[in-house]
């Protein structure tokens, strides 16, 4: 039911392209996944989302547990039917949100007790509970409940988080019973190379259908993130999809693909869109800027998204300056399409044997003027 096929390798890097098969269809890799935290990508319908070329969508267990509750989603027939998306889906376990957003009362070997920010009630989140919620939601891929340490953190604190993450992973595996849902483990370890290597080996030993690298994009220097991906890549199974969590800039994705990463997710494209910013090439354009007022050309003539094929820069500028919701939707659609096109282009370059040449500039500090 779950199978990962690699169709080509880059001869000069660790980059590869392939296909991850799920019950709701294939996911061509490398691939960017839009984030639909509450069973919706903000401001975008599922029909519009499909036009971006997105194949797999991420939702969040923590937020869906709080609202509307997994029982409501299960009664609707699962997450796919609830939101009207018939493609592959992944649910994050909510571990990151529990530790970053929740008002923690207690964390111990059993799990986490935190206060619901909506109504103040106490929630006891254990690995078993997080797994049961995700089984009720019914996405194609569920993520193991993990402890994501903040940055910076002491070595002892990160070591404790790794120990809990590995122990909790075993409990998630034992609790997970849906054969039509894959469970991915998550590598932690902060910016400590030896802890990252230990975690990679520990998680890989569970022989799960896929593996993720967590605890990045939490404030650490970019070079540290690149080193983490480079160092632990050789320790991960070659025949399983590798998912780098929370990453969505062009440079970071190019570096990650060169080191054998297959899947990415990030709120960046929609967050930028909601603030009037468009991704064009390697640049970020603020469409509120007066220079777009009389510019009647498409946002990006090479892009086939709804914003670029039907509207001008001047019109989108007008929408943003007028605080019209359509402007935010158009920019969000464009930005998602932009990242999907970028990962598609990397896959094609790997197939054609020119990835290391064509995408080397994107791994530099300032790739703004490069195209693909």
Swiss-Prot record:
GO molecular function annotations of the record: metal ion binding; tRNA-guanosine(34) queuine transglycosylase activity
EC number assigned by the record: 2.4.2.29
GO BP, sorted A to Z: queuosine biosynthetic process; tRNA wobble guanine modification; tRNA-guanine transglycosylation
Binding site for Zn(2+): 303, 305, 308, 334
Keywords: Glycosyltransferase, Metal-binding, Queuosine biosynthesis, Transferase, tRNA processing, Zinc
Active site: residue positions: 92 (proton acceptor), 265 (nucleophile)
Binding-site list for substrate: 92-96, 146, 188, 215
Reaction(s) this enzyme catalyzes, per UniProt: 7-aminomethyl-7-carbaguanine + guanosine(34) in tRNA = 7-aminomethyl-7-carbaguanosine(34) in tRNA + guanine
Pathway(s) served: tRNA modification; tRNA-queuosine biosynthesis
Gene Ontology cellular component list: cytosol
Protein origin, superkingdom: Bacteria
Classification via InterPro entries: ArchSynthase1/Queuine_TRR, TGT, TGT-like_sf, tRNA_ribo_trans-like
Entry note: cofactor: Binds 1 zinc ion per subunit.
Cofactor names: Zn(2+)
Stretch list, region RNA binding: 246-252, 270-274
Role, per record: Catalyzes the base-exchange of a guanine (G) residue with the queuine precursor 7-aminomethyl-7-deazaguanine (PreQ1) at position 34 (anticodon wobble position) in tRNAs with GU(N) anticodons (tRNA-Asp, -Asn, -His and -Tyr). Catalysis occurs through a double-displacement mechanism. The nucleophile active site attacks the C1' of nucleotide 34 to detach the guanine base from the RNA, forming a covalent enzyme-RNA intermediate. The proton acceptor active site deprotonates the incoming PreQ1, allowing a nucleophilic attack on the C1' of the ribose to form the product.
Entry's family note: Belongs to the queuine tRNA-ribosyltransferase family.
PANTHER family listed in its UniProt record: QUEUINE TRNA-RIBOSYLTRANSFERASE (PTHR46499:SF1)
Quaternary organization: Homodimer. Within each dimer, one monomer is responsible for RNA recognition and catalysis, while the other monomer binds to the replacement base PreQ1.
Protein name: Queuine tRNA-ribosyltransferase
Organism of this sequence: Synechococcus sp. (strain CC9902)
């Amino acid at each position: 039911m779950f199978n990962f096929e690699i169709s080509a390798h880059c001869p000069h890097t660790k980059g590869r392209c392939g296909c991850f098969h799920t019950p709701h269809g294939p996911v061509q890799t490398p691939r960017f996944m839009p984030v639909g935290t509450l069973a919706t990508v903000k401001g975008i319908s599922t029909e519009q989302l499909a036009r971006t070329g997105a194949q797999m969508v991420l939702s969040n267990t923590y937020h869906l547990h709080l609202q509307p509750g997994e029982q409501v989603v299960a009664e609707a027939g699962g997450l796919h039917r609830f939101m009207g998306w018939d493609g592959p889906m992944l649910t994050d376990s909510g571990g990151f949100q529990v530790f970053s957003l929740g008002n923690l009362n207690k964390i111990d070997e059993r799990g986490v007790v935190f206060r619901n920010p909506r109504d103040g009630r106490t929630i006891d989140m254990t690995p078993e509970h997080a797994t049961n919620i995700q089984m009720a939601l019914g996405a194609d891929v569920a993520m193991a409940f993990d402890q994501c340490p903040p940055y910076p953190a002491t070595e002892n604190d990160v070591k404790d988080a790794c120990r809990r993450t590995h122990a909790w992973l075993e409990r998630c595996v034992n609790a997970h019973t849906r054969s039509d849902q894959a469970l991915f483990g998550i590598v932690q370890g902060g910016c400590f190379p030896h802890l990252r290597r230990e975690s990679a080996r520990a998680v890989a030993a569970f022989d799960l259908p896929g593996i993720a690298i967590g605890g990045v994009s939490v404030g650490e220097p970019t070079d540290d993130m690149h080193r983490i991906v480079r160092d632990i890549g050789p320790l991960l199974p070659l025949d399983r999809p590798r998912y780098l969590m929370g990453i969505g800039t062009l440079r970071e994705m190019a570096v990650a693909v060169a080191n054998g990463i297959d899947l990415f997710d990030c709120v960046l494209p929609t967050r930028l869109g909601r603030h009037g910013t468009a991704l064009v090439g390697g640049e970020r354009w603020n469409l509120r800027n007066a220079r777009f007022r009389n510019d009647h050309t498409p946002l990006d003539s090479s892009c086939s998204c709804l914003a670029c094929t039907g509207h001008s820069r001047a019109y989108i500028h007008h929408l943003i300056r007028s605080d019209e919701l359509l402007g935010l939707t158009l920019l969000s659609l464009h930005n998602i399409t932009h990242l999907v096109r970028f990962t598609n282009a990397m896959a094609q370059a790997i197939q054609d044997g020119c990835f290391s040449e064509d995408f080397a500039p994107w791994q530099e500090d300032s790739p703004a003027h490069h195209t693909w």
